[in-house]
Design a protein with these regions (language model features):
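A short glycine/serine-rich beta->alpha loop
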Residues: 36-44, 76-80, 123-132, 184-191, ...
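Residue-level preference for non-acidic, small/hydrophobic
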Residues: 50-54, 200, 271
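Short glycine-rich loop/turn motifs
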Residues: 18-23, 139, 167, 260-263
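Active-site-adjacent helix/loop patches that line small-molecule binding or acyl-intermediate pockets
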Residues: 1, 69-180
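Beta-lactamase-like hydrolase cores
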Residues: 1-40
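Bacterial peptidoglycan biogenesis and beta-lactam-recognition machinery
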Residues: 59-66, 98-102, 148-154, 160-167, ...
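Active-site SXXK
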Residues: 45-63
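Structured C-terminal helix/loop/strand segments within mature extracytoplasmic catalytic/sensor domains
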Residues: 205-334
Length: 334
């Protein structure tokens, strides 16, 4: 069975392109609130689960031991734009355990933020691992390892104690089985595990509400949510979906993008978790899907919905800034 068309790209009065996908909204008790497409097919959540990957850093006491602030905790969950503040914060996290960028095993790439990339190129510099959008997460892994008295070298390997703790946290929160059959390698070299959308949404419902989690894990989840709500610019960057939407909605929503058209979110006040996947891996489709679900289910007042509207139906502009069309939720999201 094919997944339904969930987002259409309109140009003028016609549909120019269409994206198929699947999505689930689950409550903290595991009940399906709404679903479309195949929500039981395992997908790689990629960066959408970075907040879950940061749980051991908090609940182990490492964050307190190293006196990590809210901005640093937020960066540990980020797919950041490589702005100066992102790079400086990741560097400061490493310095707390006597390390530098040479300890990072995520690889280097040009900053996701155009402004940051241009700034580097302007002075003839090349990007380092600190500019990798995952450097905050990796700095968090290194901080966790050092605080636990572990050698951080090789921390990206599946059998390293850091990744064993991370996998255990994800499995606990989502109640998904993670094993060698579901494991692959992330773009930043750590393990990634294929998990059904149903389990991802359930996990984010529990992450948002704390329901069903051990008290220490629930407190860690709440601390991560609060850190990101207070520092939305750290989770992504200017003009990017997660930063802009969480700036609008504050602690009422937690959203996190992942590569290849995956998106997860939580509505903590409502005890709901959301997970979507665009079949073709299109980030624009996943963003529109999540925005449509937030708008439909969030219970926001008209003022907030008006501010969210540009993300529910994003305008398509040409190179002169002329509006030529829009993305629109379709099918089960229309």
């Amino acid at each position: 069975m094919s997944n339904p068309v969930v987002v259409e790209a309109w140009r003028g009065r016609r549909v120019e392109s269409a994206h198929r996908g699947a999505g689930a909204v689950i409550d903290a008790g595991g009940a399906v609130v709404t679903a479309f497409g195949d929500i039981d097919r395992p997908v790689y959540p990629r960066s959408a689960v970075k907040a879950l990957q940061a749980l051991p850093l908090i609940e182990s006491g490492a964050a307190d031991q190293l006196r990590l602030g809210a901005a640093e905790i937020a960066l540990a969950c980020a797919s950041h734009s490589g702005e100066g503040t992102h790079v400086a914060t990741a560097r400061a996290m490493l310095a707390r355990v006597g390390r530098n960028e040479g300890a990072l095993e995520c690889g280097a790439h040009w900053p996701l933020g155009e402004r940051a990339s241009r700034a580097l190129a302007r002075v003839g510099a090349v990007p380092s691992a600190l500019h990798n959008n995952c450097s905050g997460k990796h700095a968090g892994f290194i901080c966790f390892a050092c605080a636990q008295g572990l050698d951080p070298e090789g921390y990206v390997a599946p059998d390293h104690p850091v990744q064993r703790e991370v996998a255990s946290a994800i499995a606990n929160v989502t109640e998904a089985g993670l094993d060698n059959e579901t494991r692959a390698i992330e773009g930043c070299s750590i393990p990634t595990y294929a998990i059904p959308l149903r389990a991802l949404a359930y996990g984010f419902a529990r992450f948002g509400a704390g329901q069903g989690l051990e008290p220490a894990r629930a407190r860690a989840a709440a601390r991560i949510r609060a850190a990101v709500a207070a520092n939305p610019a750290m989770i992504a960057g200017p003009g990017r979906f997660d930063t802009e939407v969480m700036t609008i909605l504050g602690p009422r929503a937690f959203t996190k993008s992942g590569a290849e058209g995956v998106f997860c979110a939580a509505l903590p006040e409502l005890g709901l978790g959301l997970a979507v996947k665009a079949d073709d891996g299109a980030g624009r489709a996943a963003q529109t899907m999540i925005a449509a679900l937030l708008d439909r289910l969030g219970g926001f007042d008209e003022g907030l919905r008006a501010r969210l509207a540009p993300f529910v139906r994003p305008r398509l502009l040409n190179w002169r800034g002329i509006e030529v069309g829009a993305l629109r939720p379709a099918g089960p999201l229309a």
